[in-house]
Amino acid sequence: MDAATTRVGLTDLTFRLLRESFADAVSWVAKNLPARPAVPVLSGVLLTGSDNGLTISGFDYEVSAEAQVGAEIVSPGSVLVSGRLLSDITRALPNKPVGVHVEGNRVALTCGNARFSLPTMPVEDYPTLPTLPEETGLLPAELFAEAISQVAIAAGRDDTLPMLTGIRVEILGETVVLAATDRFRLAVRELKWSASSPDIEAAVLVPAKTLAEAAKAGIGGSDVRLSLGTGPGVGKDGLLGISGNGKRSTTRLLDAEFPKFRQLLPTEHTAVATMDVAELIEAIKLVALVADRGAQVRMEFADGSVRLSAGADDVGRAEEDLVVDYAGEPLTIAFNPTYLTDGLSSLRSERVSFGFTTAGKPALLRPVSGDDRPVAGLNGNGPFPAVSTDYVYLLMPVRLPG
């Protein structure tokens, strides 16, 4: 695929293709279109038919998306139409071949017995998509989707604090570290990938929303290619490219300083606990029914059990006891139930390990692996060294009453 869409002008573009592939590509491109574009043409998707098939493009000067689709191009050309409208139409069409052709300043779309006539926008006013930087490395699509979803959950959503709305991407040769925080929780994931150069080093801040959309929508295929440039020029374009399986997108990097997160991660704990993730999530949801939105869920840890409780006399109280492997002095700590279940769901593990210091300091959640030493085998009441793992979720507690 060309790095930037080639324009051949609004002509009598005519093509035929399968509804499913058309709808998937249009939906993927339209997801990134602005709700309130600065100029009308930025709400459109550009359809370009050529010898290479059909290219569907979208761009708002911050994020670009482009998908290549197999199609029978009867007559080449380009046309610009409303992206959200075309996405709604293609998703609702019956599962039959789709025919599209330009008629003057309108586009005719047919599928089975359904017919649509859509207005067009001026192709000549549409901006040229940015060129992808040089490829920096690649990794399996499933690993990319999992890792991004694990850290994006902790990213902030307040645009007045741009340094917290991004995912920090650190590259050191074959190792990539992803980190995100909203000040109340911090998620860090480390993974291996195939770097274009073994001595490559870079650290950039990428909008979390864009990366999360790319992970959820799925580039698909066996590998995802990340493009930030190579050599000393890594990240200097201020652009990240993501490509694979006939799709490519770019996003501008954030020009902000991410917090120094490693110093926040504890090296030892005064108490540790392991328990079943599914049971804990269900218990949190159950007792939180009597809590106001965002109110705390308390956890009282003792040898062999943890009591979850929530609520107050005026709204009702709830509690549930669960079995836990615990080492350390008895501890009572409280969390925002939504943030806690977010972290538990991100572990991708049947069991969770908690590492505590005090009731007023962050708790460290990590997945339990088969190599973990049983809590019952730990000596005394700590301190217990923090265990190295490829994913951690650091969560601030909520102040206990009184």
From Swiss-Prot:
<keyword id="KW-0548">Nucleotidyltransferase</keyword>
<dbReference type="GO" id="GO:0006271">
    <property type="term" value="P:DNA strand elongation involved in DNA replication"/>
</dbReference>
<dbReference type="GO" id="GO:0003677">
    <property type="term" value="F:DNA binding"/>
</dbReference>
<keyword id="KW-0808">Transferase</keyword>
<dbReference type="Pfam" id="PF02767">
    <property type="entry name" value="DNA_pol3_beta_2"/>
</dbReference>
<comment type="function">
    <text>Confers DNA tethering and processivity to DNA polymerases and other proteins. Acts as a clamp, forming a ring around DNA (a reaction catalyzed by the clamp-loading complex) which diffuses in an ATP-independent manner freely and bidirectionally along dsDNA. Initially characterized for its ability to contact the catalytic subunit of DNA polymerase III (Pol III), a complex, multichain enzyme responsible for most of the replicative synthesis in bacteria; Pol III exhibits 3'-5' exonuclease proofreading activity.</text>
</comment>
<comment type="subunit">
    <text>Forms a ring-shaped head-to-tail homodimer around DNA which binds and tethers DNA polymerases and other proteins to the DNA. The DNA replisome complex has a single clamp-loading complex (3 tau and 1 each of delta, delta', psi and chi subunits) which binds 3 Pol III cores (1 core on the leading strand and 2 on the lagging strand) each with a beta sliding clamp dimer. Additional proteins in the replisome are other copies of gamma, psi and chi, Ssb, DNA helicase and RNA primase.</text>
</comment>
<comment type="similarity">
    <text>Belongs to the beta sliding clamp family.</text>
</comment>
<dbReference type="GO" id="GO:0008408">
    <property type="term" value="F:3'-5' exonuclease activity"/>
</dbReference>
<keyword id="KW-0235">DNA replication</keyword>
<dbReference type="Pfam" id="PF02768">
    <property type="entry name" value="DNA_pol3_beta_3"/>
</dbReference>
<keyword id="KW-0238">DNA-binding</keyword>
<dbReference type="GO" id="GO:0003887">
    <property type="term" value="F:DNA-directed DNA polymerase activity"/>
</dbReference>
<dbReference type="Pfam" id="PF00712">
    <property type="entry name" value="DNA_pol3_beta"/>
</dbReference>
<dbReference type="GO" id="GO:0005737">
    <property type="term" value="C:cytoplasm"/>
</dbReference>
<dbReference type="InterPro" id="IPR022635">
    <property type="entry name" value="DNA_polIII_beta_C"/>
</dbReference>
<keyword id="KW-0239">DNA-directed DNA polymerase</keyword>
<dbReference type="InterPro" id="IPR022634">
    <property type="entry name" value="DNA_polIII_beta_N"/>
</dbReference>
<dbReference type="GO" id="GO:0009360">
    <property type="term" value="C:DNA polymerase III complex"/>
</dbReference>
<dbReference type="InterPro" id="IPR022637">
    <property type="entry name" value="DNA_polIII_beta_cen"/>
</dbReference>
<protein>
    <recommendedName>
        <fullName>Beta sliding clamp</fullName>
    </recommendedName>
</protein>
<dbReference type="InterPro" id="IPR046938">
    <property type="entry name" value="DNA_clamp_sf"/>
</dbReference>
<dbReference type="InterPro" id="IPR001001">
    <property type="entry name" value="DNA_polIII_beta"/>
</dbReference>
<keyword id="KW-0963">Cytoplasm</keyword>
